[in-house]
């Protein structure tokens, strides 16, 4: 994948960059693997805003992704590499030998015609899924489970990867994209390789309207609000807020640790660095 730039025909075009989509091989998804997706506008079932700055955006169809990789010992051939509007990574359509079709996240260097498999005896090559106990130390992995059989939850965004650092008892130590080293059960599955579309982080949105297409609404600074709306609001003329930075609910922010202890805390070997 490469980044496409534009001639500065307008202020919005000047800073805008875009993916070339050269790895995409199909323009329409597999109909049996898509669902309707209803937008929430950041509201919960009571109609109250639980996620600010969310709303609008282009209509999307949700692609059903196989995060469990539970179809074991059956090889599958990569039929297409496709765009997915619901995530930053590309997706790959697999045709299994028994006729079933499934989508997976497309790893870097996976091509149409390649064969992948989910198996304990699978080769260590991009796209193959194995339990962590069957993966050699130092291997680059993604799409990692936290609970056995629940489906992958870690390292799923474009360009991300984790690394298997050690094995001890029934746990493997995995270094995550944040720098955190975490213990994960050996029987949890992971996929070999790095998630594709690595240049996604280099794409420049370029203009406010393009963010609106993605369903992102404007983020208003607290100092620009009234006192009724934010602790930093109010004051005569332009002010700095007059206090240490806080959230709209008065909780310190910008470096203040807010993570509470959880049942999973003992499994963190090293805290994140980012």
Swiss-Prot record:
Superkingdom: Bacteria
One Gene Ontology molecular-function label: rRNA binding
Subunit structure: Part of the 50S ribosomal subunit. Forms a bridge to the 30S subunit in the 70S ribosome.
A GO BP annotation: cytoplasmic translation
SUPFAM superfamilies, per the entry: Nucleic acid-binding proteins, Translation proteins SH3-like domain
InterPro entries the UniProt entry points to: NA-bd_OB-fold, Rib_uL2_dom2, Ribosomal_uL2, Ribosomal_uL2_bac/org-type, Ribosomal_uL2_C, Ribosomal_uL2_CS, Ribosomal_uL2_dom3, Ribosomal_uL2_RNA-bd_dom
SMART domains the UniProt entry points to: Ribosomal_L2 (SM01383), Ribosomal_L2_C (SM01382)
GO cellular component: large ribosomal subunit
Role this protein plays: One of the primary rRNA binding proteins. Required for association of the 30S and 50S subunits to form the 70S ribosome, for tRNA binding and peptide bond formation. It has been suggested to have peptidyltransferase activity; this is somewhat controversial. Makes several contacts with the 16S rRNA in the 70S ribosome.
Residues covered by region (Disordered): 224-259
Record flagged with keyword Zinc-finger: no
Keywords from the named record: Ribonucleoprotein, Ribosomal protein, RNA-binding, rRNA-binding
Entry's family note: Belongs to the universal ribosomal protein uL2 family.
Record protein name field: Large ribosomal subunit protein uL2
Keyword Glycoprotein found: no
